Amino acid sequence: VVFDFDCTLAGRVQAGVEILNILAEEFGFQKLPPEDLAHARDLSTRGLMRQLGIPRMKLHRISKRGTEEMSKRMTDIQPFHDILVIVRQLHAAGFRLGILTSNSEPNVTAFLQQYDLQLFDFIKSSSKLLGKGSVIRKMLKEFQLKPSDVLFVGDEMRDVEAAQETGIHMAAVTWGYNSHASIQ
């Protein structure tokens, strides 16, 4: 079972919006007002980029700065719902557990240590926000996983699309970034 990190294991929607708005000032794109969050949850990553005027060629730098900002807030980030119980039950049942994230490995490790969740067999970190399918393929190869044996748990349209593209099973949570309607 491979989990996405941000907004699936770790609850950071609000922190993510705050950081996005800090980066908007720094990189010159539109802020996301809190009253627009519900609408934004219905958009794909590319759709949100278009709406806010985020240029693709700056995406890597913006993502890197976002990860830096997130590292300052990691001790304030809480796990989502009953995810701690679920992860512990899966581990106790003998499932191999992994994390696939665009966040940094040090941020993820700090979170796992804070909540005594060092139960994961691997953390695969990639700064690539778009093209998650290629990251999944690399993960499958690196950790010698068969697509038919993998369940990916995520919260975004891009997670669903990447799972379909790579032939892995997908479970979408509804408490994360994208709305229930958008990930069906």
Annotate each predicted stretch with a short phrase.
Residues V1-L84, A93:
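N-terminal helical cap/lid subdomain that shapes the substrate entry/recognition surface
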Residues D36-L37, L117-L130:
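A short, structured active-site edge motif that brings together acidic residues
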Residues G133-V160:
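Conserved Lys-Pro-Asp/Glu-containing loop-to-beta segment of HAD-superfamily phosphomonoesterases
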